[in-house]
């Protein structure tokens, strides 16, 4: 029997400061996360504020996690840390903390691709083998990939402009709903009429599974600009129309992505949807019906682990460690780090 592995995961790629300790038995031994409320006043993440908050709180969260788990650093088998993609300032804070712990304890360090952590967290909760179809929807990314193995992905399509999470945040800002926008728009949409406004469903008449959301964002802005009064009813109707439009786009693109994935590998029969937008219950319902109609099983992480967290970084560390993938101390933060490039990074090392 393989020895139980324990990994400390550190996540500081955006505005969540998160630390977790997980083991290879798929147990969360401790998990601490601090979301920064200061960004709400700006309608989005301010990199300088985010990085300073990571500096202020990360050391305390690491110590709190160690204490809660009733372990010591000698019990940890490796330290996993987000190295990208993300905001450089925040990434530097997390990486320097992880490198310091690794240097002092002599424990291996593993640089984690943030997107891969979103992709692999599903395997902590479901027995799902490779390959599978993957849809990542977050504040910075919206893309379909085929996941063949740890650090081995093939991109099928992605957003040509804005990410879906970014559009949710910007629409919420236009409506003065605050940040983050996704949960608020979902809540308001339940009270509105989705047929109130006709919005563009870009690329849905074209093959492939790329996305384009910039036209949708502009259309919402134009609707708002044409109103004399923005009352609660209007906010709810715009939210409902916007979310219904997003649902139609996702269904169309999923239909195409399923066909494309089956053409690539006939074994693929599961769709994993992850990232912050995957927590949206209304969109989950639309996507689930679509996948089931295509004979695919669709899987989502627990809603609280769709957004950025330390558990997914720790689990990605477990998966990488099992493959023998560890890093030296010379790696650097990356603002951009395409998931499909991971296999080439292995070859270079």
UniProtKB/Swiss-Prot annotation:
Its EC number is 2.3.1.234. Substrate binds at residues 136-140, 169, 182, 280. It comes from Ehrlichia chaffeensis (strain ATCC CRL-10679 / Arkansas). GO terms for cellular component: cytoplasm. It catalyses: L-threonylcarbamoyladenylate + adenosine(37) in tRNA = N(6)-L-threonylcarbamoyladenosine(37) in tRNA + AMP + H(+). One of its GO terms (molecular function) is N(6)-L-threonylcarbamoyladenine synthase activity. Binds 1 Fe(2+) ion per subunit. Its main location: cytoplasm. It is an enzyme of class 2 (transferase). Fe cation binds at residues 114, 118, 308. SUPFAM superfamilies: Actin-like ATPase domain (SSF53067). Pfam families: TsaD. The gene is tsaD. Keywords: Acyltransferase, Cytoplasm, Iron, Metal-binding, Transferase, tRNA processing. This is tRNA N6-adenosine threonylcarbamoyltransferase. Its cofactor is Fe(2+). One of its GO terms (biological process) is tRNA threonylcarbamoyladenosine modification. Belongs to the KAE1 / TsaD family. InterPro entries: ATPase_NBD, Gcp-like_dom, KAE1/TsaD, TsaD. NCBIfam families: gcp_kae1, T6A_TsaD_YgjD. PANTHER family: TRNA N6-ADENOSINE THREONYLCARBAMOYLTRANSFERASE, TRNA N6-ADENOSINE THREONYLCARBAMOYLTRANSFERASE, MITOCHONDRIAL. It is found in: Cytoplasm. It comes from the Bacteria. The keyword Zinc does not apply.
């Amino acid at each position: 029997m393989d020895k139980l592995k324990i990994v400390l995961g550190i996540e500081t790629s955006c505005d969540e400061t998160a630390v977790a300790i997980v083991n290879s038995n798929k147990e969360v031994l401790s998990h601490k996360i601090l979301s920064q409320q200061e960004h709400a006043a700006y309608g989005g993440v301010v990199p300088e504020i985010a990085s300073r908050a990571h500096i202020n709180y990360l050391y305390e969260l690491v110590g709190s996690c160690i204490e809660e788990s009733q372990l010591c650093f000698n019990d940890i088998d490796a330290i996993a840390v987000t190295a990208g993609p993300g905001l450089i300032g925040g990434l530097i804070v997390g990486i320097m903390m992880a490198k310091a712990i690794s240097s002092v304890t002599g424990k291996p360090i593993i640089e984690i691709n943030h997107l891969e952590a979103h992709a692999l967290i599903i395997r902590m909760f479901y027995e799902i083998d490779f390959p599978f179809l993957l849809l990542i929807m977050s504040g910075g990314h919206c893309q379909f990939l085929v996941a063949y193995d740890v650090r081995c992905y093939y991109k099928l399509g992605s957003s040509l402009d804005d990410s879906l999470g970014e559009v949710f945040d910007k629409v919420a800002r236009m409506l003065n709903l605050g940040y983050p926008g996704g949960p608020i728009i979902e809540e308001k949409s339940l009270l509105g009429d989705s047929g109130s406004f006709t919005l563009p469903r870009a690329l849905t008449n074209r093959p492939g599974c790329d996305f384009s959301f910039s036209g949708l964002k502009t259309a919402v802005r134009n609707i708002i600009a044409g109103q004399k009064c923005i009352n609660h009813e209007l906010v709810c109707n715009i939210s409902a129309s916007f979310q219904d439009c997003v649902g139609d786009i996702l269904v169309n693109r999923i239909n195409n992505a399923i066909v494309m994935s089956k053409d690539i590998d006939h074994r693929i029969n599961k769709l994993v949807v992850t990232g912050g937008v995957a927590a949206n219950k209304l969109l989950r319902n639309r996507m689930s019906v679509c996948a089931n109609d295509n004979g695919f099983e669709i899987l989502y992480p627990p809603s609280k682990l769709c957004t950025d967290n330390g558990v997914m970084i720790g689990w990605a560390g477990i998966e990488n460690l099992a493959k023998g993938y560890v890093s030296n101390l010379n790696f650097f933060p990356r603002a951009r780090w395409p998931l499909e490039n991971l296999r080439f990074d292995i070859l270079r090392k």
